[in-house]
Design a protein with these regions (language model features):
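Residue-level detector of extended alpha-helical repeat arrays and alpha-solenoid scaffolds
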Residues: 124, 423, 448-452, 483, ...
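Hydrophobic/aromatic side-chain positions at a characteristic register within alpha-helices
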Residues: 19, 57, 99-102, 106, ...
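Short inter-helical turns and helix N-cap capping residues of alpha-solenoid HEAT/ARM repeat scaffolds
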Residues: 448, 478-479, 509-510, 541-542, ...
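Amphipathic alpha-helical scaffolding segments comprising HEAT/armadillo-like alpha-solenoid repeats
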Residues: 407, 423-442, 464-474, 495-507, ...
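Conserved hydrophobic register position within alpha-solenoid helical repeats
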Residues: 164, 339, 426, 448-451, ...
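Alpha-solenoid repeat junctions
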Residues: 347, 434, 459-463, 490, ...
């Protein structure tokens, strides 16, 4: 964007000169252009936001002035503005002051004032979160209770209702009301399971994933391991299906640790066995060996615990036999012999004890093979914790697609986002505030479509998940240019949720929207995009859309994508086959090449010729 703008120093000089002669509008416009240089030096950019704050204050645009001050301003520069803005902007500002306040008592007061302002603005969830941050759990609980009743009575959003109930359970525990907490946990689990089922049914696995993550949190808060286990089993399933193997393996490790901590050793051993099989399938032998050794250790612990509590001896015996298998698969033969010795010492019938004794004798001189056994390496781990969706997603629900609010969250979080991202968010918020002012003055239906298009273009530069909700909200407008701009913007958002709106766009009554959506598909080429792309390919009646899906799939280097593309070449129409061949010629991944070479002899004439064409173009000998 910056290369099409006038030089920064010229724009700043123009703004200063205009402001000096009393032309605040000209100064504002020049500074607006200058701020488009979002990769400028930080000291220059901070100075410009300060200048813009002064100009907008002169023009009476206090919300815009406060927004500019949010970027790098101080409490001193913001205090004169907060009395002139709506409660939500006051609340956000007070929250930011509280977050950086060193004095604990003043910090609590600021959080309380922020909560009061949120309540005044009718924003119950955000008020409750502010109460929690100020350690006022009793009043937070009352707010969560009010929100939970509201959502449950409407019956429209199981997910939001489940989150509200979970927050009610959390705050009930912190205020000592365990009975209310149990009741809220029960309701929350029921609602979240219902929501997850619905999301999976309509193909929104990423939303179901959030439900299962909350189930894990519920189990940890309440001490109910069954919720932890249900959550992890489904989280791992979705991560595996989305080919996010490192995330899946890390989740396996977390699940095993959680099961051990709860004393559910048998469940931990079973999870370790599954982890070992998955790691081996994914070509990670060290992780597989680590999981196998963990499994063997845990089965021995299961056996010891069973015998200590007086359970039938067969339970301990079966657990030790599982340990034998695990050690054997890992090549730890001396340890196999040690486990057989333990089996021969169990209080079993004499024939079985002798059998295990003979087995032990076969391993007297056996040695353990040297193996590499290590957990998932640190550089492959995702150390950023799972977001508190029980707060984050309720805030999104409450914001109802507001671009100004979503962008404001980004500006006010310098610890989370880069300078460039926050600058772009500031520009998007200023655009959104201008649009809101026009809507308030003339009505939304009388605001020119170009204003909404400009907002979509500004939002597209932010490229964060939190911006998807405002874009989804914009897509519901009637003006075709707005929907086209939204779809074009979505091509920059590499998230599975992006496909929800794109699938709507692909069935839009306007051909221009469909065309832009098909182009956007080709940009969404990340591993876990396979499932939605495959679904679009199967469901679409448009050859052009199917071809776009094929081109996107050709850039995803996974076995599943390669297998599907080979199926397209073998069984589907000539247009789809041609699109697949041309796309695969330009692709860089090797999964399709490996699969095609191995199965070339089994292909029929046209399909074999097409695959040979791809292999020759990629300079692969056949």
């Amino acid at each position: 964007m910056s290369q099409h703008l006038r030089p920064l120093h010229e724009l700043r000089d123009e703004a200063r000169a205009a402001f000096a002669r009393g032309d605040a509008v000209r100064a504002r416009d020049a500074l607006w252009s200058a701020l488009q240089h979002t990769i400028a030096r930080e000291e220059d950019y901070v100075a410009m936001t300060g200048e813009l704050r002064e100009v907008l204050t002169r023009l009476g645009d206090h919300r815009g002035a406060l927004t500019a001050s949010w970027y790098a301003g101080t409490e001193q520069s913001q205090r004169p503005l907060v009395t002139h803005v709506p409660p939500i902007d006051r609340a956000r500002t007070l929250l930011a002051w509280a977050d950086r306040e060193p004095d604990a008592e003043r910090q609590k007061r600021l959080y309380g004032r922020a909560a009061d302002e949120y309540e005044a603005g009718g924003l119950v969830a955000q008020a409750a979160i502010a109460r929690e941050r100020g350690q006022d759990f009793a009043r937070a609980r009352a707010l969560w209770s009010r929100l939970a009743q509201l959502l449950s009575s409407s019956g429209a959003d199981f997910y939001a209702a489940g989150l509200a109930r979970f927050n009610l359970a959390r705050t009930s525990l912190r205020t000592g009301d365990t009975a209310a907490a149990r009741e809220a946990v029960f309701a929350s689990v029921h609602l979240l399971e219902e929501a997850a089922d619905r999301y999976e049914t309509i193909g929104q696995r990423e939303r179901a994933f959030d439900c299962y993550q909350v189930l894990i949190a519920i189990g940890r808060e309440s001490g109910a391991f069954e919720h932890v286990l249900e959550g992890y089993v489904n989280v791992i399933r979705i991560l595996r299906e989305d080919h996010l193997r490192y995330y899946a393996l890390q989740s396996y490790e977390e699940a095993v640790a959680a099961a051990e901590k709860q004393g559910e050793i048998s469940a931990a051993a079973t999870l370790s066995r599954e982890m070992a099989a998955y790691a081996r399938k994914e070509g990670l032998p060290a992780v597989a060996n680590f999981a196998m050794m963990t499994q063997a250790r845990l089965w021995q612990e299961v056996s010891g615990a069973a015998l200590r509590r007086g359970a039938p001896t067969e339970i301990g015996e079966n657990a030790l036999l599982a340990a034998v298998i695990a050690y054997g698969e890992a090549g730890q033969y001396r340890r196999v012999g040690d486990v057989y010795r333990g089996l021969s010492e169990l209080p079993l019938e004499e024939a079985r004890k002798k059998h295990y004794g003979r087995a032990r004798a076969r391993y007297v001189d056996a040695q353990d093979l040297p193996i590499d056994a290590a957990p998932l390496p640190a550089h492959l781990r995702h150390e950023v914790g799972f977001p508190e969706v029980w707060h984050v997603d309720l805030v999104e629900w409450e914001q109802s697609g507001s671009a100004s609010q979503a962008a404001g969250d980004v500006i006010l979080d310098p610890s989370q986002w880069s300078e460039v991202t926050r600058r772009r968010a500031m520009l998007a918020r200023l655009t959104a505030l201008s649009l809101e002012a026009q809507e308030a003055a003339a009505g939304a239906e009388r605001v020119p479509a170009g204003v909404f298009v400009a907002l979509a273009e500004q939002l597209s530069t932010v490229e964060l998940y939190t911006i998807l909700s405002p874009l989804e909200h914009l897509f519901r407008r009637q003006e075709v240019p707005v929907r086209v701009a939204v779809v074009r913007a979505l091509s920059r958002f590499l998230y599975k949720r992006t496909f929800i709106t794109l699938r709507e766009a692909l069935t839009d009554p306007e051909p221009t929207v469909i065309h832009e959506a098909a182009k956007a598909l080709e940009e969404l080429r990340f591993p876990h995009a396979f499932d939605p792309l495959a679904r679009i390919y199967r469901e679409s009646q448009s050859a052009a859309v199917r071809a776009s899906a094929v081109r996107a799939l050709s850039k995803i280097d996974t076995f599943e994508a390669a297998e599907m593309l080979l199926g397209v070449i073998r069984h589907d129409g000539s247009e789809e086959r041609a699109a697949a061949v041309e796309a695969l010629k330009r692709a860089r991944g090797m999964k399709f090449i490996d699969l095609a070479r191995g199965g070339l002899a089994e292909l029929s004439g046209p399909a074999q010729a097409a695959v040979r064409d791809v292999l020759q173009a990629r300079a692969v000998s056949v």
